């Protein structure tokens, strides 16, 4: 008797999915942990790649420009940019195997024909395409940054003005609300402040403009030293 084995894997998988058959430790060890390890390996690989890339470029840049800056009028700025793009292309290929992956795809596309073309000129074309795309991307990004600088300054100034106006408006509204609450809710009448000067008793009181001079003279008379009798 021949057994139908087409649904064996499905039945076995359904059997393992039953609650009594699920082992959380095995699930973590066999499924979750390997995926987590793969993600960590890729993350570490990217960090290592970026560290090496910027280290090598810093060495190259310091050897060409000891002062630490690239002049916009320097004739070597474009060769430096081209060499920098080439370094990035080779670093990307070395760390992420772009050429090997695309070469496999090209070889599969040209099976039994143009084998020499796919093995020799395929990687060269890949490198050229990567280099051109990277160079165009850098040039385009630099143009966007240069054009965006005035716009960014205008936006920042507008935001600052809006924030200042909003703060003044909020303070005014808060003052108005407090004033209305004191008058309407508590019945407090706010009197306008007059000129207040200390009286001869040491207290403060409201004075009119006519009595201000006499009060000042009285205060000066009180502060005069008393004569000493011999």
UniProtKB/Swiss-Prot annotation:
GO terms for cellular component: membrane. The keyword Transmembrane helix applies. It is found in: Membrane. Pfam families: DUF999. InterPro entries: DUF999 (IPR009340). The chain crosses the membrane at residues 78-98, 120-140, 148-168. Keywords: Membrane, Transmembrane, Transmembrane helix. It comes from the Eukaryota. It is a multi-pass membrane protein. Belongs to the UPF0494 family. This is UPF0494 membrane protein PB2B2.14c.
């Amino acid at each position: 008797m021949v057994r139908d084995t087409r649904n064996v894997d499905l039945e076995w998988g359904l059997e393992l999915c039953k609650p009594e058959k699920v082992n959380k430790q095995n699930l973590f060890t066999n499924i979750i942990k390997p995926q987590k390890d793969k993600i960590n390996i890729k993350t570490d690989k990217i960090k290592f790649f970026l560290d090496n890339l910027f280290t090598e470029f810093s060495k190259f840049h310091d050897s060409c420009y000891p002062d630490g800056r690239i002049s916009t009028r320097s004739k070597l700025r474009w060769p430096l940019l081209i060499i920098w793009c080439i370094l990035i292309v080779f670093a990307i290929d070395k760390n992420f195997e772009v050429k090997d992956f695309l070469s496999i795809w090209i070889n599969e596309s040209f099976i039994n024909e143009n084998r020499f073309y796919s093995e020799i000129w395929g990687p060269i074309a890949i490198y050229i395409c990567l280099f051109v795309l990277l160079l165009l991307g850098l040039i385009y990004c630099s143009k966007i940054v240069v054009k965006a600088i005035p716009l960014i300054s205008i936006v920042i100034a507008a935001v600052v003005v809006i924030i200042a106006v909003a703060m003044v408006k909020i303070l005014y509204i808060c003052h108005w609300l407090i004033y209305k609450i004191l008058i309407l809710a508590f019945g407090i009448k706010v009197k306008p402040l007059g000129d207040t000067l200390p009286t001869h008793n040491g207290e403060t009181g409201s004075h009119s403009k006519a009595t201000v001079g006499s009060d000042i003279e009285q205060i000066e008379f009180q502060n005069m030293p008393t004569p000493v009798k011999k």
